[in-house]
Amino acid sequence: MYSLDITQQNQVARERGATPHNSEVESVAVSRDGKYLATVDCLWSDLSRIILKFWHWSEETNNFILNTQVEFPHYQGVRSMCFQPIGPNQTVPLLLSVGNDKKAKLWQLEKSWSCVSCLSFRQLSATGGGWSSDGSVIGLSFGHL
């Protein structure tokens, strides 16, 4: 069992007369080697926000450390995420995210994570995605299945 504070904000006591706004973790992906973690936390209110966070495992602290935060990685939420299986010749990790904005995105780590490709098909909704077992092929579904 492991505990990690993803949203880093839900501990504040409620202000008098104000409605508390708590973020919820809606999606989590862990790389097969356990070195990388991606989370999506959302706040659905008049202050709506979606944040994709990339975490790296630290052997020194024996803890995940936040590396990158991306606000609104997909403008209408994230359906799913998965890391590419890392092969023997691969040194750069990739994450595939599928959003409710009709797009799938590839994220790559350099010093920080950034979107390196945005994929869409005929204005159809992206409904799912995944990697082949060796990480060489991406499968995406668009539209009605």
Which residue stretches match the model-derived regions?
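WD40-repeat beta-propeller superdomains and closely related acidic/aromatic-rich repeat-like regions
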Residues: 1-145
